[in-house]
Amino acid sequence: MTSSSKPARKTSKSKSKASKAAEAPAAPSNELSREAPTFQNKVIDKKALRSLVAWSYKHHGTAATSALADDLKDLGFRFATQAAVSISVDDLRVPGDKSTLLQEAEDQITATEERYRLGEITEVERHTKVIDTWTETNERLVQSVRRNFDENDPLNSVWMMANSGARGNMSQVRQLVGMRGLMANPQGEIIDLPIRTNFREGLTVTEYVISSYGARKGLVDTALRTADSGYLTRRLVDVAQDVIVREDDCGTTRSIKVAADDNGKYKSRLVGRLLAEDVVDGAGEVIATRNTEVDPPLSARIEAAGIAQVQVRSPLTCEAARSVCRKCYGWALAHNELVDLGEAVGIIAAQSIGEPGTQLTMRTFHTGGVSTAETGVVRSVVEGSVEFSAKAKVRPHRTPHGVEAQLAETDFSLTVKPSGKGKTQKLDVTAGSILFVNAGGSVPNDTILAQISSGSAVKKSVEKATKDVVCDLAGQVRYEDVIQPKEVPDRQGNITLKAQRLGRLWVFSGDVYNLPPNAMPVVQGGANVKTGEVLAESRQVSEFGGAVRLRESQGDSREVEIVTSSLTLKDCKLVATTTHSGQIWHLESKDNTRYRLNTEPGTKIANGEVIAELADDRFRTQTGGLVKFAPGLAIKKARSAKNGFEVSKGGTLLWIPQETHEINKDISLLMIEDGQWIEAGTEVVKDIFSQTAGIVTVTQKNDILREIIVRSGQLHLVSDSKVLARYTDGGGKMVNPGEEIAPGLKAEAMHMVEAVDTPEGGALLLRPVEEYAIPNEAHMPELGSVKQANGPSMGLKAVQRLAFKDGELVKSVEGVELLRTQLLLETFDTTPQMTVDVESAQDKRAKTIQRLQLTILETHLVRRDTLSDASHGSTHTEVKVADGDNIKRGDVVATVQILCKDDGVAQLPDRKDDEPIRRLIVERPSDTITVDLGGSKLSLKAGQRVVEGDDLGGGLTCPHSGQVEEVKGSSLTLRVGRPYMVSPDSILHVRDGDLVLRGDTLAQLVFERAKTGDIVQGLPRIEELLEARRPRESAVLCRKAGTIKVEQPEGEDNPTVSVNEGEELHTEYPILLGRTVMVSDGQEVKAGDLLTDGPINPHELLEVIFEDLRGPLPTMDAANQAIGRLQTALVQEVQNVYKSQGVTIDDKHLEVIVRQMTSKVRIEDAGDTTLLPGELIELRQVDQVNQAMAITGGAPAEFTPVLLGITKASLNTDSFISAASFQETTRVLTEAAIEGKSDWLRGLKENVIIGRLIPAGTGFSGFDEQLKAEALPHPDILGEENAGYRRATNLRPDYTVEMPLPQSNTAVLDDPSDTELEATRSRHGIEDRTNLAAFARPAAGEELAEEHVPDPGALEGLQEEGLLSQDS
């Protein structure tokens, strides 16, 4: 079918929707060409099948295609049955050259390990090289598997299955017959030990365990990611659910550019789009006109004409309000026809992006690691000399594998001139390529010349990682001078050492001894020592001195205790009584005072703890009651409520008893009444009896009895209200003996008098008062103490404590103890954590009597002798004191000696400012090597460092790495050492001269590794993009166009980058540590270009581009262009993630979503409009408002475009019902209520929630009429001539309530019929010309805002007329 007839056909089709509906659903009959199939004689795989079915569908319709598909299925089954295709173990053919490939890899890795051992490369470079070697071997093995099957067994079942696309892919076949390859550990790091076998050969135990890491990870990932993916889909649906195709053509002139790839191919990116401009070929001939649908044949013609880019219409640039028009959307991919009106394209887009999320996740880890596929390695074809062209600029560069090479800074050409016959080899080198040859150098044939960069700076997303360098031998650390360690303080003031340059750390072998704390070396540095000699000695000395007690040894240590001070209670016996709950200890003094012990012998107590309490019943009451202090009695505010209040001055305590029962039962159980006098033993509530006689007070709440109080005393009925009044205030009065209480009533003893109500009338209750005398000083037993001259001292203190304060009411039935006398321990001049031991000691005179003794002990743990181990050497321990000795302060209790294991020379480490020596080293004879020089003269001096394999001269190679100790005659003594390469910025954990043991960490290498483009990156990356998250360490973006200047200041790690913007304008950009600069000196850059590597912050990109365009262009155009650039970048980024996983999604789906994310702007300054600063509003609306302002001459609103993540965009939709059903329901609804929002039910979700027909698909036609109705003005407004309308000030400009000037006789109607109007006019006597207020209906294109506040007057009028119910 020719393309010229195509546009005409399509437009006629879109005009008559009715005729289209009547036609066959697959495709209208006039489109089926019934073209006969061409004969095809080839193997048909999945791809060919797909195109066959598509061809059939296009040319022969649905019915024929389904019949064809059925026949194909039958054919497949029939022949599969006859061929008996099944998979057996024998079908897994391992390629023969596997062993050769593995051997090559092994050799490469051995060489790398050797380079590492000689300190030529760092640990990181070794690791990278190993992993890259295995990755490459794996790839080569896959090729070999392919070749093997293709050439030797093309009909192999496994090969057919994987190759036809039926099931499985090469990555799985590789694991069956190649090698399983590299695996990751649970932290996601690659283990550099690959699985060399495949499933056919079987795995070793180690390989099996390693591979099970990955398998577990796969299962867990799948489970977690399914949820993630589902949530992503839900957010996408929510943001795009109201995008429906609502019109045929929005008529926009804006478009997006689709560019061909490097090979001039468009693949499927043009198919299904409509052209925005005519496509003209080189000869000026029009290939296709605007609005032509691009089908595959037309796409092929455009490619053939060599057109590099085409402008097409896209949902991104569609100007339809809140929807997409058919022409901008293009084909609906379900049936490759122009999309229908009413199609819910938003939801289709959301599902298309969300659904592959689950597939994404399930692709578990394949190879990971740094892939070298982005760069092409070029080898020399001839032997010859290398020349660079004149404009070549290179700088030294170290590759990730530790190879010294050069990095090209400009584009130039490299030639290899052959030394003999042959053609000159010419090579175009792009900036960023790595060169492995030097200009003027000669190269043999088949040598790697360069790694050519793909030109554009490959944006790798990198992350910082660290790797520890672990020491392989014990010895002393020495730096090479090149490292130049620098002290870097961090925020906390800790200082770390960092290497500034690439260099080596050496460890020179020796026997290192760890010294215990406080051990002092006994030998001098440089002294010769013999096996068994003492190297260091540590002494344990007594801090205070005292009597020594040697305890029995436990395990491998003995305890030496020294009693520094003790305290004995001389006049008290220690008595134990056994009860069923254990032993209770008492102290009994000569005058029969008894103290109950709170601790027991064998325990420890601290300062201020109670040792014993006086057993004393004198202060025990019968019942609860009220506490009153008589004047004179004083207490301290004691710290602990548990122990009560300490008495500071003795005196009298008054106690008024009363019995309180706490009940909490139903009121029906009460057996007495409130105010009644009862006798002792009366049952007050079922099963509860009173202990004393007295007046009852009942407290109840909600028919529940709370408490019953019984107040004992004498009751006197009194009728005089004045007398009663005297005793009602303040809960009664104290009366002394002999005082008159009432006429004719005298107090016999001290009483508390209260007025009470009884069933018989008013009365006075005389309550008895008990007095307790409290002494000034508590009783204190006699003490005897022993104390060292400067040891800690201690004593006992007797304290009286009152349990209650003045005026406190004690609610209780049983009695309470009012006063307790306690013995407290007091220790002085001691550390807070010091404890005192409680012991029972025999009386020196009477052996049968036990006394309580408190002692302060100093304890020393003395270890047994140990035989030598790897780091400590042998130790010998001696205890220098005997049991019962009395020693002085500073006397030695025990010594520990460290003995030498081998003969050698002892050396002490370099010391800094008297820091203690924690290690020492013995250089043994085995740590040096003597090399016989055989008479050759060497230029080596003592102290020089050599590496194994170095040429010593005279045909001698160095047998071992190390340092030259001395050159004597014909022999050379070498101290064995091991070099470790450290890279710049590494953190050094050891200083020059430190002693290290095997397994210690020497340094931490800081390096950047490419994040594995693995799916664990996949979903979170897509989420990051769609949620528009700000990346942690984003790239530095250029803010204004100009020329780059890169400088490297002396002594600084980081280069400085500045952009010369012309006219003396320079902008300097700070480059953070560890950032790679992506631009070179003299390069031209535009606003928004990357200056350093790292992820782009989309918000910053939008802001930068908008600010740059805002000057030369009007704000609206600047916003449109900035949004456009951001949109393409976003679509591209998301596509990259999916493509890297082999998932194809049509661009238009992403465009629909991205359009929703970028549709809003933030108002900066409202100008004369009614918008609010900071408000988020659609760009379209602001444009309309600003156009209106331009007509009226008002100041327009200033705004900046914003990018909203999908969650934010969903919560910021016009429909509050949709937003509330998504997240934060309460907040959304509350805000909507406060703002008085209206929901116009435009999307699908709102309508589903309300329960209406959705405005898509078949429900679209009704919606269509509603749109048309909304577009027309109100009938009343049409008949209006009078200009008496004013705009309501509190409303948004896009929805107006027209209000008449105030008038006395006004009726207000909304949408009335003519007869109603007539009736109203006649009823109110209104003339025809009177103003009528009406709500103006907005036009279809206008925005209907949320806050529509109806005029209260209008509502009242409607209610009066009965056109609106009163309650609505």
From Swiss-Prot:
Region (Disordered): 1-38, 1340-1368
EC number: 2.7.7.6
Binding sites annotated in the UniProt record for Zn(2+): 250, 318, 325, 328
Entry keywords, A to Z: DNA-directed RNA polymerase, Metal-binding, Nucleotidyltransferase, Transcription, Transferase, Zinc
Requisite cofactors: Zn(2+)
Disulphides: none
Gene Ontology CC terms, in alphabetical order: DNA-directed RNA polymerase complex
Biased composition regions of type Low complexity, renumbered to the chain: 19-29, 1353-1368
Catalytic activity field: RNA(n) + a ribonucleoside 5'-triphosphate = RNA(n+1) + diphosphate
Cofactor-binding details, from the entry: Binds 1 Zn(2+) ion per subunit.
Biased composition (Basic residues): 7-18
GO molecular function, one term: zinc ion binding
An individual GO BP term: DNA-templated transcription
Subunit description: In cyanobacteria the RNAP catalytic core is composed of 2 alpha, 1 beta, 1 beta', 1 gamma and 1 omega subunit. When a sigma factor is associated with the core the holoenzyme is formed, which can initiate transcription.
Function: DNA-dependent RNA polymerase catalyzes the transcription of DNA into RNA using the four ribonucleoside triphosphates as substrates.
Assigned protein family: Belongs to the RNA polymerase beta' chain family. RpoC2 subfamily.
Record-given protein name: DNA-directed RNA polymerase subunit beta'
Species: Synechococcus sp. (strain RCC307)
